[in-house]
Amino acid sequence: MGSQELQRKLGFWAVLAIAVGTTVGSGIFVSVGEVAKAAGTPWLTVLAFVIGGLIVIPQMCVYAELSTAYPENGADYVYLKNAGSRPLAFLSGWASFWANDAPSLSIMALAIVSNLGFLTPIDPLLGKFIAAGLIIAFMLLHLRSVEGGAAFQTLITIAKIIPFTIVIGLGIFWFKAENFAAPATTAIGATGSFMALLAGISATSWSYTGMASICYMTGEIKNPGKTMPRALIGSCLLVLVLYTLLALVISGLMPFDKLANSETPISDALTWIPALGSTAGIFVAITAMIVILGSLSSCVMYQPRLEYAMAKDNLFFKCFGHVHPKYNTPDVSIILQGALGIFFIFVSDLTSLLGYFTLVMCFKNTLTFGSIIWCRKRDDYKPLWRTPAFGLMTPLAIASSLILVASTFVWAPIPGLICAVIVIATGLPAYAFWAKRSRQLNALS
């Protein structure tokens, strides 16, 4: 067993690239249409993206403080543990491993193949093997080198931003101001009310998730006291600007009623640009593959750090805490999570069912934001960076997180509650087993 610790090798730009690369995913290809449908008017659509990004800043401030107080790998697991609840911390990690981390790898890999199928026909079984090959390729990349993986992540993040920049640049030339004078597509949107805006903001929520992924790797980040706040808040602002400009341009390119009813808003909007025309679908498919490749790479890189942290605390399978003696990476954790992701590729029905665990994952995030209140009561709590206007920012972080909890509950209330029961029913016995084992190991040491 490798007993060495992971080293701090990641600088600011690599960390920023991971945060932005994880956040800018496939969701943006449909979310503009969903936000337009919810908000009901072009201006409310754009404003929803602005406010949707701004309300994420308090969340990033909370993560920044917690990550500088506990500059180690593990993110939510570490913060909940230090807030005084090891069982809750374990349950958060337990749910993440089985219902979120590995399934997300399979979902993204299959999404890449799906977009590839737009360019050339692919046999379904062959497509699954291609998806598995993508996971294996990224496993090898991130297993062999943290620096190499970070360099790739930086390049792929730049590559995924370029197509959106092209869309924004071209869209400005064919922007039609009259599209912003279009009548509202919903009764609530016609009133320009706060409820219409709130509906739009809620629809943007998923587009802004992912920045906190870097907290899983805080133990490998150089100078976390400065790097984490800059990367977390900086990534939020960068994504906010990108999404707002994209929403503005798309709303100005095509009639708003068509945008609000579009399931492929970016692709449909690009058909209104003469320079692209019929090639819009191909452009979007290639862009989507690049975007999702970056997100898949990022997840293969950061997600195994959670199980690594739990294993180091003797609260998970011991092998997950192994560090490769040459490459200084959590090799076993990367391999086993990737292997489980490949398994889910070939059991697609199970993967779709695991989507119902989203309610549990959203509630876990809310608990994490609340954990800072308990952490601040500890005598040994000494963060290197503190949340400004703590009394305002923390409630905002919790409230904005609850928006996702509420919308997810409305989407699938009964399945979501059943999944919560499953997490508790399986997680607590597992915690009892590992907690007992941990006490025994501590007694022997």
Swiss-Prot record:
One of its GO terms (molecular function) is L-amino acid transmembrane transporter activity. It is a multi-pass membrane protein. It is found in: Cell inner membrane. Its main location: membrane. The keyword Cell inner membrane applies. It catalyses: N(6)-(D-fructosyl)-L-lysine(in) = N(6)-(D-fructosyl)-L-lysine(out); N(6)-(D-psicosyl)-L-lysine(in) = N(6)-(D-psicosyl)-L-lysine(out). Keywords: Amino-acid transport, Cell inner membrane, Cell membrane, Membrane, Transmembrane, Transmembrane helix, Transport. GO terms for cellular component: plasma membrane. Pfam families: AA_permease_2. Is likely involved in the transport of fructoselysine and psicoselysine to the cytoplasm, where they are degraded. This is Probable fructoselysine/psicoselysine transporter FrlA. It comes from Escherichia coli O157:H7. The gene is frlA.
